[in-house]
């Protein structure tokens, strides 16, 4: 019987991850305790109607939100768990987190960057618990501009732990959708969510005017019985609530980067460089009647994507996958104040960091430490060389984590497809190199190797393929080309 949990654990080890907490870190964890809430200068915001929105099964809650309408716009507050209070720089817990740099979500088992006693308890913004947080405050004007912003430490309390699917159904007023339990009879919380949704929409509209790219993406999660049998592959797509949180977090990340720049501290930026394969993106657009300029231009690409989403929605997920592949991966880079650095091409922002998930990503924990240094006007706790090395480490381990997650999902998909050998599918070429090509079918949304790939194929080409073999233990899914 296929044991996906064993496969996931071995994949973690093969990629150099720590899967068991080292003894010294365990000793520190055993002595971890609730923080004292009497520190001078820390604001007490526990009376506010904070709420969180996350996945149904999320237990590591990194951020909560609050909104207040005022003249000139909506003031948004993002409270991010103060993980640094528990995980001090250069401690054994910090060393373990720095080694892995990220939580890994395989769909059958989560390998948290920080032990669960911290990430799902003491440093998680769980409902009803008083917690320390680093708050990003920003005023969103009616045209979507962030006209004021600051950051500070505070005591907060999550009043309502909500989920993406339930909030999205409620916001969209879907027929038959049940009002989330926390919203029943709670008019103030309903007003809160609608204010946050409206502010997020303004932010999103302004970013898309600047060239932020519209995509339709799908996350595949295996459904496994208690005995480890794969019974289904569920596709989860972004909805209104995920976009709400995403838009607020993007704005908070921009504020974080600007805050450190303003205070003269170096930072770790999240960048997606100008795409090297713009020529192929242009060629794809031309096949669909689009006309992109010779030089990379996010505004033109976004206009084309929106037009395709309206006129050809059935194939927009395919197009999204192809363009995402051609844009290239994101990476972390150290930035010194005053120096130019690449921006994030896909989000159409120049100054961007990761800062809102310190329980899950080490880059965010580093950002939190830098912000706290800026708040008390001290020097950076890291040298430029140290930050540069840590940025490289975070990029490398993120790539490793993606490969672990992808392998486990491919093993699950191979198990599901075992009875479909010989079946034919419509597919799109999702990757290509000197060794061959990869294709992705739509139902289920699974990627596999294309045997004997023709040299004329490139990312985005539609092909007709036959499933010829699978190996669930190794995650191999092989297709043969029928026509292109």
Task: Report the location of each language-model feature.
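Electropositive polyanion-binding surfaces
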Residues: 1-451, 455, 459-460, 470-477, ...
């Amino acid at each position: 019987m296929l044991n996906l949990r064993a496969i996931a654990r071995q994949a973690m080890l093969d990629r150099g991850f720590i899967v068991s907490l080292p003894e010294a870190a365990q000793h520190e964890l055993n002595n971890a305790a609730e923080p004292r809430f009497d520190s001078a200068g820390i604001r007490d915001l526990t009376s506010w109607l904070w709420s969180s929105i996350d996945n149904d099964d999320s237990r590591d809650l990194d951020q909560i939100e609050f909104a207040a309408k005022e003249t000139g716009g909506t003031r948004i507050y993002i409270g991010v768990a103060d993980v640094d209070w528990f995980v001090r720089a250069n401690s054994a817990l910090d060393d373990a987190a720095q080694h892995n740099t990220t939580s890994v979500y395989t769909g059958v088992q989560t390998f948290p960057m920080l032990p669960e006693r911290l990430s799902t308890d003491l440093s998680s913004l769980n409902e009803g618990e008083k917690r320390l947080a680093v708050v990003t405050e920003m005023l969103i004007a009616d045209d979507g501009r962030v006209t004021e912003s600051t950051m500070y430490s505070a005591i907060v309390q999550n009043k309502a732990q909500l989920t993406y699917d339930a909030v999205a159904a409620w916001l969209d007023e879907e027929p038959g959708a049940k009002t989330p339990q926390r919203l029943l009879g709670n008019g103030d919380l309903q007003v809160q969510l609608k204010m946050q949704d409206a502010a997020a929409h303004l932010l999103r509209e302004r970013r898309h005017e600047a060239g932020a790219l519209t995509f339709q993406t799908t996350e595949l999660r295996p459904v496994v019985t208690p005995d480890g049998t794969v019974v289904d592959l569920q596709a989860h797509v972004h909805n209104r609530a995920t976009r709400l949180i995403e838009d607020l977090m993007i704005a908070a990340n921009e504020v974080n980067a600007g805050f450190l720049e303003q205070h003269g501290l170096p930072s770790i930026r999240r960048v997606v460089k100008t795409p090297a394969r713009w020529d192929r993106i242009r060629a794809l657009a031309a096949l669909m009647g689009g006309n992109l300029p010779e030089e990379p231009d996010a505004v033109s690409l976004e206009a084309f994507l929106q037009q395709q989403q309206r006129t050809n929605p059935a194939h927009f997920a395919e197009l999204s996958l192809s363009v995402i592949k051609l844009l290239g991966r994101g990476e972390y880079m150290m930035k010194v104040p005053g120096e130019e650095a690449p921006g994030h091409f896909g989000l159409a922002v120049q100054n961007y960091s990761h800062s809102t998930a310190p329980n899950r990503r080490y880059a965010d924990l580093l950002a939190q430490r830098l912000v706290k240094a800026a708040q008390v006007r001290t020097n950076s706790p890291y040298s430029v060389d140290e930050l540069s090395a840590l940025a490289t480490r975070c990029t490398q381990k993120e790539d490793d984590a993606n490969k672990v997650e992808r392998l486990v999902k491919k093993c699950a998909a191979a198990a599901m497809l075992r009875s479909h050998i010989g079946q034919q599918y419509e597919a799109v070429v999702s990757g290509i190199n000197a060794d061959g090509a990869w294709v992705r079918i739509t139902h289920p949304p699974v990627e596999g190797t294309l045997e004997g790939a023709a040299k004329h194929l490139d990312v985005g080409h539609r092909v007709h393929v036959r499933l010829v073999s699978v190996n669930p233990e190794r995650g191999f899914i092989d297709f043969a080309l029928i026509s292109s």
